[in-house]
A protein has these predicted regions:
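Acidic, low-complexity cytosolic segments
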Residues: 2-29, 38-148
Length: 148
């Protein structure tokens, strides 16, 4: 089983197992990833390579950030986003909030049943509860920049 930030822990192994179960129960679902609000991958299904998981985490965090901006400007002012969905040629990206500071992203085939994917994701988020909490990274001050 492949995990994100702390390989080998029981929680991460259980989370990976639950993500894999989501794929098995959801026809057309191809990949699943748990990420932090700031785009760090926390856990992924084995079908995603490390590089793909990094890229998907960055994409999903960016989409969620933009969605929060749209909600703050054009929604009820709370800035809350329940979910985001992006259809592209060859697939659909679903993103839902999943605990404090965490998101669940799923890539599905373009002919997948969006309602079923969303429902399965919601069930998983409810099931996971505390497992999907991801506190924001602390600001450790200025970061070193690479020499030119």
């Amino acid at each position: 089983m492949t995990t994100g930030t702390t390989p080998g822990t029981t929680t991460d192994a259980k989370l990976t197992w639950l993500l894999q179960g989501l794929l098995e129960r959801t026809p057309g679902a191809r990949h699943a990833l748990v990420l932090s609000r700031d785009g760090l991958k926390l856990c992924r299904t084995p079908e995603l390579s490390v590089d793909q998981a990094d890229q998907l985490a960055a994409i999903a965090a960016g989409i969620q950030s933009l969605s929060h901006g749209a909600s703050a400007e054009f929604g009820d002012g709370s800035g809350g986003v329940r979910s985001a969905m992006t259809e592209f040629y060859g697939g659909i990206l679903f993103i839902v909030e999943a605990g404090e500071g965490a998101h669940l992203a799923v890539i599905a085939a373009e002919d997948a049943d969006a309602g079923l994917v969303g429902h399965t994701m919601s069930e998983l988020v409810e099931q996971l509860g505390e497992h999907l909490r991801a506190a924001p990274r602390a600001d450790d001050g200025p970061r070193a920049t690479p020499a030119s």
